[in-house]
Amino acid sequence: MKIAILSRDGTLYSCKRLREAAIQRGHLVEILDPLSCYMNINPAASSIYYKGRKLPHFDAVIPRIGTAITFYGTAALRQFEMLGSYPLNESVAIARARDKLRSMQLLARQGIDLPVTGIAHSPDDTSDLIDMVGGAPLVVKLVEGTQGIGVVLAETRQAAESVIDAFRGLNAHILVQEYIKEAQGCDIRCLVVGDEVVAAIERRAKEGYFRSNLHRGGAASVASITPQEREIAIKAARTMALDVAGVDILRANRGPLVMEVNASPGLEGIEKTTGIDIAGKMIRWIERHATTEYCLKTGG
């Protein structure tokens, strides 16, 4: 097969591993910067160009689209989809997952347990919002945040009000969420491919911090997950219509809670921690699903 990887930086670990895994299985691979793609949207002859040349047909596309370029990155991916390329994750699913508020609403509708979460637009509702999630300590999150950026633990009610007011002063959209104290700064990252959790790690926050993201200095170890955690991770990925997802779970006294579903999970931390060839599993998923029937169905 001919596979395109959409990424702004082909030197990143995840891109290199996906490229290596695809080549090892006999596929042709090209890494394309989505911001250098431009499109002819034409009902008679739609096409996509890259740095002055018209791109050939790709059997499959692996999107590694960062949050900062979600709008144009998903537009480029959508063009590949229109031309019959199989997307490892569909553009509509990526856009949906990037909206934290919408994601939580969809997950809640499917009965997936979450931390109690509130959102309000008016400053007049701040006090009620804090009470809604059980008071302080609580977590304030930017809706557009990623990798632990824009996440603040407010340990007192006064601190919570100050943080919420400060974010509102920046015209930022925020979520207010209960703090799961018993998680003790740890979460579980489950890597889902299709209908299987292929790997899981426990991420522990750096001493003195509460965010466990590896990009923020957290440490990782292999996690043994329960059948309930496995089931909830797969259900969360399926709810978001993602074939590949990083599902972050908090272990609360009342059971596992889904904190976030990531549409473009990094591979470095979880592969190096577990020793599992996740990139290879992703390529094998593509091989099973990037079929002639898919191309015919989508017009390729």
Swiss-Prot record:
Its cofactor is Mg(2+); Mn(2+). Mn(2+) 2 binds at residues 260, 262. The keyword Magnesium applies. Mn(2+) 1 binds at residues 248, 260. ATP binds at residues 141, 178-179, 187, 211-213. Mg(2+) 2 binds at residues 260, 262. Keywords: ATP-binding, Ligase, Magnesium, Manganese, Metal-binding, Nucleotide-binding, Protein biosynthesis. It comes from the Bacteria. The keyword Ribosomal protein does not apply. Its EC number is 6.3.2.-. One of its GO terms (cellular component) is cytoplasm. Binds 2 magnesium or manganese ions per subunit. Residues 104-287 form the ATP-grasp domain. GO terms for molecular function: ATP binding; metal ion binding; ribosomal S6-glutamic acid ligase activity. Mg(2+) 1 binds at residues 248, 260. GO terms for biological process: protein modification process; SOS response; translation. An L-glutamate ligase that catalyzes the ATP-dependent post-translational addition of glutamate residues to the C-terminus of ribosomal protein bS6 (RpsF). Is also able to catalyze the synthesis of poly-alpha-glutamate in vitro, via ATP hydrolysis from unprotected glutamate as substrate. The number of glutamate residues added to either RpsF or to poly-alpha-glutamate changes with pH. Belongs to the RimK family. This is Ribosomal protein bS6--L-glutamate ligase. It comes from Shigella flexneri serotype 5b (strain 8401). The gene is rimK.
